[in-house]
């Protein structure tokens, strides 16, 4: 049996088109093209624009990888792609490209759960030890997992309303700041100015819920504007970030203690947040934190997770 794998991976779940090439677990090429600058003109992601962007760029990125690596595409053994979750039109572009390519080059098709790939995004350049607690915080999801193996991933807590990243984007937009909101709010964060209390903290065991926080912050801004009361946007943004990150940390501590775990892996776009990373690193556990380039949507995490599944004769769990 051939144990040498050449894996092309594809990510197209939202507004990033990304392709990567792995020789076994070694990343040898990685391309990301984002439509965020286009989306920012509309204040957020427009699904139709995002899927059209994927269609325009996916072949170009594939050709860039071929030119850069000089590989013969017929030597690719596996084509991994994000199967779910994501924007339907965007996922469709990646899926069609992956399927057509796999047929043309006679490669094995590997559908991947995007969220579980985020869980393992830190494994691109380090080994993870099972069992561990997994945290995925992004524009679409806020989830905590118990991870016993590559295909044994149990949801412990997840949001049933707005994801944390979505709240960042919407609050930034109401403040008049550009999309995406996460990096801008984080850049402007000042702990000594985080003085506002919008809502009360929730019990640690309760599912993630950021809708009430988002609504309270936006109402505060709207009320101030309507009454012509001046306010400092940095105070509002800092207060929001401090509360939101503290809620995440509180839940992490709860589940680490509940399951007697001392390993923690984080992923997703919000895992790039400097306050979250700082607080994670201060916990008395072994933490796996992805490099900044691997925090957002990217094909490297898809390929790394695909390799682990292939190598260990496992399949991605195609449910959240």
Swiss-Prot record:
Q: Where does substrate bind?
A: 136-140, 169, 182, 186, 273
Cofactor(s) the protein requires to work: Fe(2+)
InterPro entries of this UniProt entry?
Answer: ATPase_NBD (IPR043129), Gcp-like_dom (IPR000905), KAE1/TsaD (IPR017861), TsaD (IPR022450)
| Top enzyme class | transferase
Where does the chain cross the membrane? none
| Subcellular localization, as worded in the UniProt entry | Cytoplasm
Gene3D superfamilies in the record:
3.30.420.40
Annotated Gene Ontology MF terms?
A: iron ion binding; N(6)-L-threonylcarbamoyladenine synthase activity
Superkingdom per UniProt = Bacteria
Which EC numbers characterise this protein's activity in its record?
2.3.1.234
For this protein, the record's Pfam families field holds: TsaD
GO terms (BP aspect):
tRNA threonylcarbamoyladenosine modification
Query: What GO CC annotations are associated with the protein?
Result: cytoplasm
Q: Which UniProt keywords apply?
A: Acyltransferase, Cytoplasm, Iron, Metal-binding, Transferase, tRNA processing
Which reactions is this enzyme annotated as catalysing?
A: L-threonylcarbamoyladenylate + adenosine(37) in tRNA = N(6)-L-threonylcarbamoyladenosine(37) in tRNA + AMP + H(+)
Residues involved in Fe cation binding: 114, 118, 297
Its function, per the record, reads:
Required for the formation of a threonylcarbamoyl group on adenosine at position 37 (t(6)A37) in tRNAs that read codons beginning with adenine. Is involved in the transfer of the threonylcarbamoyl moiety of threonylcarbamoyl-AMP (TC-AMP) to the N6 group of A37, together with TsaE and TsaB. TsaD likely plays a direct catalytic role in this reaction.
Instruction: Write out the similarity annotation.
Output: Belongs to the KAE1 / TsaD family.
Q: What is this protein called?
A: tRNA N6-adenosine threonylcarbamoyltransferase
Q: Which organism is it from?
A: Ureaplasma parvum serovar 3 (strain ATCC 700970)
Gene assigned in the entry: tsaD
